[in-house]
Amino acid sequence: MNRTRIAVVGVGSLGQHHARILAAMDDVELVGVVEPREDRGREIASKFSTNWYSSPAAVVDQVEGVVVAVPTVLHAEAASCFLQAGRAVMMEKPVAADLATAKRLQQMAEAGGALLQVGHVERFNPAFELLQEKVQSPLYIRCQRVSPYTFRSTDIGVVHDLMIHDIELVQALVNSPVAAVDSFGAVTMGPHEDFAVARLRFESGAIADLTAGRMCPQAERTIQVWSEGGFVSADLQTRKLTSWQPCPAVAARPGMLHDVVAATAAPLTLKDEVFSKWLQQEETQASDADALTAELRDFVAAVRGETRPRVSGIEGVAAMAVAERVLEGMSGWSWQSGSPFEQVRRAA
């Protein structure tokens, strides 16, 4: 069996897990880990029986693909030599720290004939996969993604760190261009926004409201979708889905409950029948399969030419473009006295 030769560039808190998973794959050879901190690089290399390299250039000729998991501001520097050499790259999200750089990386991939995949791991969350199966033609989507301040990814704000997950998810669900964006946010800990709210209006008519924050005592990752077929709520942490849809009688005659109420002497008693008689409720527990493993499996298959990556550079850049519009919309908002958001962002 020919093993696919992969390296991991950056073995911090996330990169070490990429290395662990790839090292355990029988059909993959973990060629090495690239890490500028020698102690850390040698530690992870020893742990997974591979080699340590101090720079990306040292492994370009040895690999078919790489996973780039360095801080966002270093993405372009770390990935350029691989893309130019035609090597496949899976870039952790977001593609880059700004849209112009993200576009340049995608153009570099196209010019070099290289595969560029973006690590939007929530696309591989079994709860989202199940949600996507259940939902057709969404009309309204609401996403909530909040967490405590972890002191990770402090080189970017909450829009590029957290909200971009949900931007990409709703784009996958709606499959329509974004027509308009309204947004606001706040800088609390700084230097970037720690809280953001955005409303996306799609050309299809669908609307999505997104909330992201990293100043909350407890983590939450939920997505709720309303469509003509009913309502689905997914908890992306517990992977539990709850859905409601009208019973056949209601579905066949929208508005029929008005007639039922009119014909009932005590209409307030009907409330006990809503979720037993008129709306059918279903609870589903999605698989506990590891999303990061599934994402890396997708990347390896794409490197071999067996499939198109689920989230290509094109989709990753599209999510970045919407994220930039969210940030632009926040320029007139600030809850930090004397420091308009845009001034704080430019200073950072």
Describe each model-derived feature in a short phrase.
Residues 1-48, 170, 346:
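N-terminal Rossmann-like dinucleotide-binding module
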Residues 188, 208-294:
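NAD(P)-dinucleotide binding in Rossmann-like oxidoreductases
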Residues 96-153, 338:
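A contiguous active-site-proximal alpha/beta segment in oxidoreductase catalytic domains
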Residues 67-68, 284-286, 291-348:
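C-terminal helix-rich "cap/oligomerization" subdomain common to oxidoreductases
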Residues 18, 48-107:
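Beta-loop-alpha module in the N-terminal Rossmann-like domain of NAD(P)-dependent dehydrogenases
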Residues 54, 91, 116-118, 142, ...:
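Hydrophobic residues in well-ordered beta-strands that form the structural core
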Residues 50, 85-87, 112-115, 206:
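A short helix->loop->beta-strand "cap" motif at the edges of active sites that frequently abuts
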Residues 150-226, 237-238, 314:
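Rossmann-like dinucleotide-binding domain that binds NAD(P)(H)
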